[in-house]
Structure formats: C-alpha cells, structure tokens
Amino acid sequence: MTVPQASVFQGITEEEWLQMGPACSMKWGLYEKGRTIFRQGEPAAEMGVVLSGGVCIESIDLWGDRSILSHVGAGQVFGETYALTGGPLPVAAVAAENSQILTINVSGLLKERYASSSWQRKLLGNLVYIFAQKNRALSARIFCTSAKTIRGRLLTYLSAQAVEAGSSAFSIPFDRQQLADYLNVDRSALSKELGRMRDEGLLEFHKNRFLLQRLPEGL
C-alpha cells in the first residue's frame, strides 16, 4: 500500500513507509455511519487515520447526554493524544458517515530502537503540528459554546465556517443532530432558530449547505 494522504504522514517516503510497517500493527477497517471505532472508557493504545469519510469525537455522560467535541475529516487523525499518554479513553470516536479507517499502535512507532530513523523524526514533527491544530479547533468550539443563546452559537459557528471556506456559501460536516450536539443545544430548538434566521433573511440552508446573507444588527 502506498503512503496514505494524511497529515501525520506528511513527508514520509514510500521507502520510509515500508520501514514503518514492522514497527506497529496497522489495521484497515470500514465503518458504517454511527458505528463506534474507539469506545469511551476503553484503554487507549491506538490512533486512527481517516482515509475516507469522517469521524465525530464525542463524550457521553452518565445520563446518556452526548456532546460532540470535534469532527475529524479525511486525511486527519484522532486518538493520538490518548494513545501517547495512556489510560482509559475519556471520549468515543464514532463514524459520522461511512468511513475507511486505518488504526495504528502508537507505542510501536515510538520505540527507542527507531530513534535514529528519518521516518520517526518526521512523524513526531507532524504530531506536534497536529496537536497545535487541534488546540485551535478546541478553542473554536469554546468560542461557539460560550455564547448564551442558540442564535449566538449558530452565528459564531457559521461565521467561522464561512471564514475557513473563504466564501459566504459553504458546507458543514454535521447533520442537524450532530450540529446540536456540537453546539450543546436541543435539536428541536436549533431547527426552530435556523428557521427564524432564514425567515429574517440572515441565511439560507439545505441540509448541511449554508449561505450567509447578512449579519444581524449589532454584529
């Protein structure tokens, strides 16, 4: 198999990829939407690479309430922080759509015997960059959920998505329930607020496709 198009393997050559094979246990799997890849509470030993599709990182409390912390798209990784630090997973990784996932045993990749290898240095450098990107994504969610109203959370999130897309027309990686879980609001209340915002001419939407028309007064 050729080197997957993923951020964690940036700069890894075909030769280095072949050298990495014996260092860890790699497994490829197909996951239907809604299927759990890493279960909350289980020991963390592997990281996942999204080859196609997408994954939601979520937390479920003792009462069964779900919060989506982030979305991981194709070419991105998940679970690497917990695999490096060990212990039980405080979150779950669930397929957001039909997805192809590569799972890798992290401890094997970081063994001291490979310290002089070029691929390990590249891998560690890539992981540092990934950590920084994920810290930024976490900050973005904190900004969204700090707004006191559903409309405020929607505007913060959708505005950020528009900036990232470089256009007032864009797609988001969530369906309605996933968006509600990400913003930590009730789905029915979210749908009603979206309808009101559309009626007021603030935006248009169809499924996960949005068009921002104008900002409300005062913003």
Residue ranges of predicted features:
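Cyclic nucleotide-binding regulatory domains
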Residues: 35-97
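Phosphate-/nucleic-acid-contacting segments
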Residues: 150-153, 157-219
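An amphipathic alpha-helical interaction segment
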Residues: 126-136, 153-160
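Cyclic nucleotide-binding regulatory module and flanking cytosolic helices
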Residues: 1-36, 82-84
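Short helix-to-loop capping/linker segments positioned immediately adjacent to catalytic or ligand/cofactor-binding
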Residues: 91, 111-120, 137-146, 164-167
